[in-house]
Structures are given as C-alpha cells and as structure tokens.
Amino acid sequence: LKVFGFPLRGWSRTPKAIEGVEGFAGEAQFADFLKGTDILVNLLPLTPETAGILNYQTFRGLRRDGLDGGPVVINAARGGHQREADLVRALTDGTLRAASLDVFEVEPLPQDSPLWALPNCFITPHIAAASTETTGVAYFSKVIRAHEAGGPLPNLVDVQRGY
C-alpha cells in the first residue's frame, strides 16, 4: 500500500519498531490505531485474544474520512478473526465500503452465506498464500540444513502465545 501513497500503520500485541510503519500495541492503543486506518489488512495469528476481532465495533472505529466511500477490510489470516454477521451488516449499512475475504468462519463458505450476494464483498477460496513445490522444497531444505548444523530453527511456535 505504501507504493500507492498510503501511510502504513501496524498494530500488534507487543510494541514493534518497523521502518516506515507507525506502530501501535496492545488493547489500549487499538482504538487510536483504527481511527487513522483506511484499509485494514488482518494478518494476525488466531489466538483467544484475537478471535472475533473483526467485528462491528472494530469496523465502526475505522477512519471515516479517508477513502472515498469509506474504509475497506481485508482478511487473509483466519476465519475465526471475523464475525460474518457483523461484516454483512457493515457492508450493507455503509460502515464498510468493501471487504476482501480469503478465510471464513466455516470453510468452504456455505452456498447460502449472504456474503456471496454482496457486490462489495470480494471472495477468494483461501489462497492468499499460494506456494509452489519449488519454494516448499527450498524452504524445507533450508530448515533441514539449519537443524543439521545445530543452528536455530525458523518460525517455531511459542505454545504459550499460541503462535
């Protein structure tokens, strides 16, 4: 989004310093983060704390005077983050201009879901992060080499945090 002139803002559980990104952290800064956000891209891990975070209250907190027609939500993380009834409400009452959803509370998205009928809801079949066999093998080989060399393994799950 930066190449299109959008300022970048990020929110996480703990403070982070990322060059070119205005950072917000913790529950206390969530509302301030939303107030300046036109396009909300969710890539959070799904934990008990983030389940249902994409809800009507969150959508109402997004910046109202930025994008023509209102804010946009993109969820490419986990379906458990969103409350689809709240998405339908926000997309039909104008709280959200649009949504792009790659994940759903129930997958595949049921044929009778009202999301299918909304012209401002763009649906993809859980393919936001497609991998090729070549990239998969290259990554796996890198992990094996690191393990054999006694080095640290990448992307280990912290079971206490849930991701």
Language-model-detected regions and their locations in the chain:
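Aromatic pocket-lining residues of Rossmann-like dinucleotide-binding sites
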Residues: 1
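Residues at the starts of beta-strands that form the adenosine-phosphate
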Residues: 6-7
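The conserved SAM/SAH-binding core of class I Rossmann-like methyltransferase domains
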Residues: 11
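Rossmann-like adenosine-cofactor binding region
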Residues: 15-114
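C-terminal helix-to-coil terminal segments
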Residues: 17, 107-163
